[in-house]
Amino acid sequence: IYIAMNKNNVKITVVGLGYVGLPLTIEFSKHFSVIGFDLNIDRIKELKLGYDKTKELSKEQLLNNSNLTLVSDINEIKESNIYIITVPTPVNRNNIPNLNPLKTASEMVGAILKA
């Protein structure tokens, strides 16, 4: 990854724009072209308007960022060469994680990599 990140053609996609994914997206976008992807269309609309319901980021951080693209269409992340998946893995009362969101996101990214 280090070698790839030193190239000018780096395009990172962060899948899942929650408490982990959104701040990570903003940090990477300080140095690289980044696509923030989330299946929740309303979440993307809110972020594009500068509103973060998690209150992790300010309006300025979201709107004044030329390296950041926010999308909910999986086809818009095809050009990326680095994918980071940051989806929830909630635990049940026995502390067993539900890995279904991670499996689904991995399958989505995998389908793009195969195409």
Annotate each predicted stretch with a short phrase.
Residues Y2-A115:
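Structural/interface elements that position substrates and couple domains in central-metabolism enzymes
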